[in-house]
A protein has these predicted regions:
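Glycine-rich phosphate/pyrophosphate-binding loops
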Residues: 141-163
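Active-site-proximal beta-strand/loop segments in catalytic clefts of secreted hydrolases
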Residues: 30-33, 57-62, 90-93, 116-120, ...
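Conserved acidic residues
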Residues: 112-113
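Electrostatically charged, flexible surface regions
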Residues: 166-291
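Gram-negative bacterial Sec-dependent N-terminal signal peptides
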Residues: 1-20
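A cross-family phosphate/adenosyl-ligand binding-site feature
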Residues: 22-23, 27, 38-102
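Charged helix-capping and loop-helix junction motifs
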Residues: 129-135
Length: 291
């Protein structure tokens, strides 16, 4: 009898181990385009269809360009809406949505991976600094979670601008499919108990708005360091200021940077750590300011 009980216990433990090994990858999706954005809702559906455990927490309204801003009001009650199963609309910024996802919805069962996007428009050059999409991913990395920011580019032609970027919206689903294929690749290489991506690093993907046959490949590249400013200001006689768009910023970027390679038809991979540290400049500052 004792042998039978011991055998049953071993089999039960073995079954539990198999279940643990087969536990689906848990993914938290966020964005800055809002909880109705098809770039993220469709990504949730596609990932869930592959068997992943996918949760989405996004701003209730479009928060594009809000960067890393947060709502800091302790005691405030937020009117969170549950839009669908595992999908929440949070009345705040992308960083707020991320925090609510990590420290609210999933606080007892954290995700294996955070994905921000797929964003409507590129996040290269200065746009990466402004981006709520990239900022949410960088915040996740700083917390210690593997994170991907995903965006689709623009074709900078007069026709595209006048018609509100039709190529971007046409190939938006393709960019989501690409992200799913990337998750599949990461998951296939993932060893249980270890991070799914290198610890402390995030990946910003920019996908060109082109048919797959015209995409030239993948190119790892740093974010453009000194981009043309997008915005200017005109000081008016009455003391007010009028914001203007710099026409130079609307021209297709060229050169050896993320904007240039995206515009050449490459999927760009830009790595980031979210640390805001630059210790390699210490010696230069010590020479200027002393120790």
């Amino acid at each position: 009898m004792r042998t039978k009980i011991l055998t049953a216990a071993i089999l039960a433990l073995s079954a539990a181990g198999v279940q643990a090994a087969e536990k689906p990858l848990k993914i938290l999706l966020v964005n800055d385009d809002g909880c109705q954005s098809v770039g993220t809702t469709s990504l949730q559906e596609k990932l869930a269809a592959k068997g992943y455990d996918v949760w989405m927490v996004a701003p209730a309204t479009n928060q594009s360009g809000i960067g890393s801003a947060i709502t800091f009001k302790t005691g405030k009650v937020f009117d969170v809406k549950k839009a669908a199963d595992k999908r929440y609309c949070f009345p705040g910024t992308p960083a707020d949505a991320l925090d609510f996802g990590l420290w609210g919805v999933l606080k007892d069962a954290p995700p294996d991976l955070v994905i921000s996007g797929v964003n409507d428009g590129p996040n290269t050059g200065m746009a990466q600094v402004n981006s709520g999409t990239v900022s949410a991913a960088a915040r996740a990395v700083r917390y210690g979670f593997p994170a991907i920011a995903a965006s689709i580019g623009y074709r900078f032609t007069e026709e595209e601008m006048k018609n509100k970027w039709p190529s971007t919206h046409k190939y938006w689903p393709d960019s989501g499919d690409y992200v799913v294929s990337l998750v599949d690749k990461l998951n296939a290489a993932h060893k249980p108990g270890s991070p799914i991506m290198p610890q402390g690093a995030g990946l910003s993907i920019n996908y060109p708005p082109l048919p797959s046959a015209e995409i030239k490949g993948v190119h790892y590249i740093e974010n453009e360091q000194f981009p043309v400013p997008q915005i200017g200001y005109e000081l008016l006689a009455d003391g007010t200021a009028k914001q203007t768009m710099n026409p130079e910023a609307m021209k297709p970027a060229e050169g050896d940077n993320d904007s240039g390679w995206l515009n050449k038809g490459y999927i760009t991979y830009t790595l980031f750590d979210g640390s805001w540290n630059a210790p390699h400049y210490q010696a230069q500052f010590e020479a200027l300011l002393g120790k």
